[in-house]
């Protein structure tokens, strides 16, 4: 029986109740078979093209880095059906669930983007869908909650713990433990127990593959750096995967520094966490001196996660990728700038990556460089959050 590697260096693994091991084994075997099955790959490809709208554009910015020698491109995952990169891998996993004969889908969501993507895939493929969402996130992401319900999903608010994404993850795993024979747990990021980090990476890797081809067509060379925000890390690993072996391309992940790393109110476990066991995996984790999981914080619900995918931890450990962070204010400034200068409203998550790219462009305006930011989602869901903050600051 062929097996995928469960670890990335020392990170990853499968720390779950014994009852879930057969379900994870089945998932791994079906994934391996599906990857070798031309008809599965063809169906996935057709859904991505005809339904989701791939390939997405690689847009060269016109004004935002005008006074520098940087060329900045945006990989437009915001143009994907559903509004973010999430749709890619959800379609892949939903097809896998059907292949396994599962009729129900369980999911967790933070910003609601993964929930929306799961709901649309379930509507399309005729699967029953229930989504766990922290009660706090239900409040701050009401448009997405309604979108899920419109597409037939049941949204279950989670009131335990911090009532955010980590609690929704725990509840979803609990549900799956009780119902794995008929339900597939459609995990929303490149984290959690093996084989999820690998499956999600493979179902997102077209982001980097397309970027590579588009960049060669437009510029005749590969970019100097690809930059992506990191919460759980799926949009980033989707961008990085095809560039890992291209040693001249820097891989830069951007974690949320929240109100500032020094305040403790952030979501940057890669650079400021300790290794621990959470959500079925061994990975960097925000924890206090007693080893208790600390609350993560970010202006963007989708980055508000106290851990991170194991492959990112490994890429950092071996020095292949670099991880920076951007504060709420820096992300907000980048958000406003992209709206005003390019006519694109980005997700607050993606704005963290953009903030770092702008920093690179402006710290040495005379440096010639070719940068790509993965614009992982659109910002419609964030306009009310931004409105309230700008109002509070007296800017509107």
Swiss-Prot record:
Catalytic activity: (1S,2R)-1-C-(indol-3-yl)glycerol 3-phosphate + L-serine = D-glyceraldehyde 3-phosphate + L-tryptophan + H2O
Keyword Translocase attributed: no
Cofactor: pyridoxal 5'-phosphate
Pathway in which the depicted protein is active: Amino-acid biosynthesis; L-tryptophan biosynthesis; L-tryptophan from chorismate: step 5/5
Stored CDD domains: Trp-synth_B
Record keywords, A-Z: Amino-acid biosynthesis, Aromatic amino acid biosynthesis, Lyase, Pyridoxal phosphate, Tryptophan biosynthesis
Enzyme Commission no: 4.2.1.20
Magnesium keyword on record: no
Domain of life of the native organism: Bacteria
GO terms under cellular component: cytoplasm
Pfam families, per the entry: PALP
GO molecular function: tryptophan synthase activity
Sites bearing N6-(pyridoxal phosphate)lysine, chain numbering: 86
PANTHER family noted in UniProt: TRYPTOPHAN SYNTHASE (PTHR48077:SF3), TRYPTOPHAN SYNTHASE-RELATED (PTHR48077)
Main function: The beta subunit is responsible for the synthesis of L-tryptophan from indole and L-serine.
HAMAP family: Trp_synth_beta (MF_00133)
Subunit and interaction comment: Tetramer of two alpha and two beta chains.
Family classification: Belongs to the TrpB family.
Protein name: Tryptophan synthase beta chain
Lineage: Bacteria, Pseudomonadati, Pseudomonadota, Gammaproteobacteria, Thiotrichales
């Amino acid at each position: 029986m062929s097996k995928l590697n469960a670890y990335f260096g020392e990170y990853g693994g499968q720390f779950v109740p014994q009852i879930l091991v057969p379900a994870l084994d089945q998932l791994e075997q079906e994934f391996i078979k599906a990857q070798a099955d031309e008809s599965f790959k063809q169906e996935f490809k057709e859904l991505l093209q005809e339904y989701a709208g791939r390939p997405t554009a690689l847009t060269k910015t016109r004004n935002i880095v005008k006074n520098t020698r940087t060329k900045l491109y945006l990989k437009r995952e915001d143009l994907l059906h559903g509004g973010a990169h999430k749709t890619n891998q959800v379609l892949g996993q939903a097809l896998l669930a059907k292949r396994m004969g599962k009729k129900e889908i369980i999911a967790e969501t933070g910003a609601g983007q993964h929930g929306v993507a799961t709901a649309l895939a379930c509507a399309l493929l005729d699967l029953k869908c229930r989504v766990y969402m922290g009660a706090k996130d239900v409040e701050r992401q009401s448009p997405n909650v309604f979108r899920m319900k419109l597409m037939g999903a049941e949204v279950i608010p989670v009131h335990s713990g911090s009532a955010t994404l980590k609690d929704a993850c725990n509840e979803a795993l609990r549900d799956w433990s009780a119902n794995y024979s008929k339900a597939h747990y459609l995990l929303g990021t490149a984290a959690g127990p093996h084989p999820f980090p690998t499956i999600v990476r493979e179902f997102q890797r077209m982001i980097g593959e397309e970027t590579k081809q588009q960049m060669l067509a437009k510029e005749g060379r590969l970019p100097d750096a690809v930059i992506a925000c990191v919460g759980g890390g799926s949009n980033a690993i989707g961008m990085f995967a095809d560039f890992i072996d291209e040693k001249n391309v820097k891989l830069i992940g951007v974690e949320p520094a929240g109100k500032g790393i020094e305040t403790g109110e952030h979501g940057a476990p890669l650079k400021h966490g300790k290794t621990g066991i959470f959500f079925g995996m061994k990975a960097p984790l925000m924890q206090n001196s007693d080893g208790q999981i600390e609350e993560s914080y970010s202006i963007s619900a989708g980055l508000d996660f106290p851990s991170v995918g194991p492959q990112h931890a490994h890429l950092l450990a071996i020095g292949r990728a670099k991880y920076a962070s951007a504060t709420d204010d820096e992300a907000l400034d980048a958000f406003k700038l992209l709206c005003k200068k390019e006519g694109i409203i980005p997700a607050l998550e993606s704005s963290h990556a953009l903030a770092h790219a702008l920093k690179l462009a402006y710290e040495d305006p005379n440096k010639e460089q070719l940068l790509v930011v993965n614009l992982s989602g659109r910002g419609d869901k964030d306009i009310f959050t931004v409105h309230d903050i700008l109002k509070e600051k007296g800017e509107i």
